[in-house]
Amino acid sequence: GLGDVYKRQVPFVYAAEESIASSELSNDIQVSKPEYATGNMEADGLLEPVTEDDPEYHKYLENNDPYGIMTMSALWGADSLTHQNRFSGVSKVYGIDVSYYQGNIDWKKVKNSGVEFVIIRVGYRGYGSAGTLVEDPRFKTYLDGATKAGLKVGVYFYTQAITTAEAKAEAKFVLDKIKGYSLQMPVYYDIESVDYDTGRLDSAGLSKAQKTALCTAFCDTIIKSGYSAGVYANYTWLNYYIDGAGLGKKYPIWLAHYTSNTNYDQRMDMWQYSGSGTVSGISAYTDVNVWYSGKLPLYVSDLISVKNN
């Protein structure tokens, strides 16, 4: 998931310098040993959640890997990943996603390390029964810093909606937070289960069609305001819990699958292939992604004409 675990009992391999093509990225990005994030999170005071029901918090405190075992080095270069044949003629653009739990970030170092884009958590709906909407405390700081550093920026919202009305409310919450900002990447709807607890979404027992409708309600509300919208989900959710194929006919799909060679066969615009990358300028583990495109998505200004069509 987004900003996945900081304690992970899988093989960690440091990157050999020659593993990354110098023309692509620097050697500042590599897989870290498990102690890396533990110590740095303690130093940054990040071992407390934003709120008690922040659905992402548990990912940093449990040994959990919901999307498959990562047995590779989480590098940016193509040496680490096997890309599907359908992407053989497509440019690969590498980036990260971050939330409060990445701590204080030196965005200049991030940019210099070879990162080209960042997806920032706007906020989340609490996974408790109240379902309170909460802004990520570092959202605006991250957005300003990443923008000034020259990174392409998108955002995501971690849902715990159980009705389409709540999904639309989440979209309006996001639109209010990003008002006045320029985004070059989509607004993503992060739909997944809460790790090591039962969130309100799972407790609701919604059908596949109902959970898919949540995604549609959120994305369509975002699109009506002139932004691009997409869906983030892991391999299991896209295949079994929501209609990944159907959603892919309308929106960009951001797949989370922690492996060096995903076999997901539906639309996949971006692949989050590890939650344990380390990036210069960030002290905690960071999710790493590859965007399959000859160029990054249209700027928001290019999408405004769609609004009234």
Label each region the model flagged.
Residues R8-S22:
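Sec-dependent signal peptide cleavage junction
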Residues I20-Q102, K108, L247-N309:
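Functionally critical loop-and-helix segments that line ligand-binding/catalytic clefts
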Residues N40, T163-T164, N234:
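Intrinsic-disorder/low-complexity, polar/charged segments
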Residues E62-Y67, N85-G89, F157-T159, I222-G226, ...:
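A generic short-segment signal for beta-strand/edge and adjacent turn/coil regions
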Residues S88-C219, I223-S225:
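Substrate-binding cleft of extracellular glycoside hydrolase catalytic domains
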